[in-house]
A protein has these predicted regions:
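Extracellular loop and loop/strand-boundary signature of outer-membrane beta-barrel proteins
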Residues: 113-118, 173-178, 213, 294-298, ...
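Long, hydrophobic/aromatic-enriched structural stretches that serve as scaffold segments
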Residues: 78-158
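Residues that define the transmembrane beta-barrel architecture of outer-membrane proteins
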Residues: 48-54, 122-126, 143, 182-188, ...
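Residues on the lipid-exposed face of transmembrane beta-strands in outer-membrane beta-barrel proteins
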Residues: 54-60, 100, 128-134, 149, ...
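Outer membrane beta-barrel transmembrane domains
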Residues: 108-109, 234-352
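Repeated loop/turn-to-beta-strand initiation elements of outer-membrane beta-barrel proteins
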Residues: 63-67, 138, 198-200, 235-238, ...
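Transmembrane beta-barrel strands of outer-membrane/channel proteins
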Residues: 34-40, 96-104, 147-153, 192, ...
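Short coil turns and loop connectors of transmembrane beta-barrels in diderm outer membranes
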Residues: 28-30, 62, 94, 124, ...
Length: 352
């Protein structure tokens, strides 16, 4: 029965992608780069809550043209809500990306096969996300629109974590039968954000950048949030090219941008930021339509959340960059087993 349901969900996934596959006449290079995100809480000496994620982002015009793309639906939603009117009167340009990834969540005691009702539920999400970045250079303003579609509760989550824990010689997780939407359930999230650059001293060898962003999500995470992001050092990429605030645990894939100074020293900078979020609903903790053995009620999850992050980026070859970061969040649910989730991540990117 479970395999039959998962087969039906895969069919829904393929149909949605085929319907979404449209090409728009936007002047943009076919391939502007790629980015690989690797998150894991073992790097932060933890093994619970958001325990890890991996995502590959491909950017450029190809993100609109790939068979496995949600660009048509995302663009239709923007048009339905009149998002295009926000930037249409002023000079602007647009960049696109598509991301494929997965995220895993566990309680603290992963050796226990029985349901654990007073800790975070097991959870997983396998997803595809399409993003459009619109930049208005004269106003130092940028907009992000992202549509994420995926599946909660797939059996593949257990096998992936077992493989990772075999490599790291960690305990085997035995409770995946109790995960949110166990057996598989489709889900989605639509994200809109606007960001404003406040400081950008382009002519200095080392410079500061400071920007604010406001974001709203509707779907498997429904929330509103505001953030402040900063970076300092030897910077050759535009202010809108780094978006640590655009994340739902793992960073949602934004377009990759090349540096504007390939004759001078390569990039080397630090970055940091913080955000405040008011979350109305989280499918990864409260479940969705399908029955979940372990899930929280609305009263058991924290509504007001805060996050902080700190990272560093090094361009070790022309337009090839590596980043390492730490990220921490306030408690996401109530009770004695609630902790402050902390995780670390490695990002490798190549821009063209």
């Amino acid at each position: 029965m479970r395999k039959t349901l998962q087969s039906r969900y895969y069919l829904i996934f393929i149909l949605l992608i085929v319907i979404s596959n449209r090409t728009y006449g936007i002047e943009e290079k076919y391939n502007t780069g790629w980015r690989l995100n690797l998150d894991n809480d073992i790097l932060a000496e933890s093994d619970r809550d958001y325990t890890g994620g991996i995502a590959l982002t491909l950017s450029g015009r190809r993100a609109q043209e790939y068979l496995f793309s949600l660009e048509g639906v995302r663009n239709w939603l923007d048009g339905l809500l009149g998002i295009h009117r926000r930037y249409a009167p002023q000079p602007h340009f647009q960049l696109h990306s598509v991301q494929y990834g997965t995220m895993l969540f566990t309680p603290e005691d992963i050796t226990e096969p029985a349901p654990i009702f007073d800790d975070r539920p097991y959870g997983s999400l396998f997803f595809i996300a399409n993003t459009e970045l619109t930049v208005a250079p004269s106003d130092d303003k940028a907009w992000l629109s992202t549509l994420t579609f995926g599946f909660l509760g797939l059996d593949a989550a257990e096998y992936i974590q077992k493989a990772i824990h075999a490599l790291t010689d960690s305990d085997v997780a035995n409770g995946w039968d109790n995960q949110i939407s166990s057996g598989g359930e489709p889900t989605l999230m639509y994200t809109l954000s606007v960001q404003q650059n406040h400081i950008d001293r382009v002519n200095s060898a080392r410079r500061h950048e400071l920007k604010t962003a406001y974001e709203a999500n509707a779907g498997f995470s429904t929330d509103v949030n505001a953030s402040l992001s900063w970076r300092w050092g030897r910077i050759n990429t535009p202010w809108w090219s780094i978006n640590p605030q655009h994340a739902e645990y793992i960073n949602l894939g934004t377009p990759v941008a090349a540096g504007n100074n390939q004759t001078g020293p390569r990039e080397l900078y630090v970055w940091a930021g913080s955000s405040v979020k008011y979350r109305v609903y989280s499918a990864l903790m409260q479940g969705q339509f399908r029955n979940s053995i372990v899930k929280f009620s609305s009263d058991e999850v924290e509504k007001l959340l805060a996050q902080v992050w700190l990272g560093a980026t090094w361009e070790f070859a022309d337009n090839i960059r590596g980043s390492f970061f730490y990220r921490a969040s306030s408690k996401e649910f109530k009770g004695p087993n609630a902790h402050y989730p902390v995780w670390a991540g490695l990002i490798i990117s190549r821009a063209y």
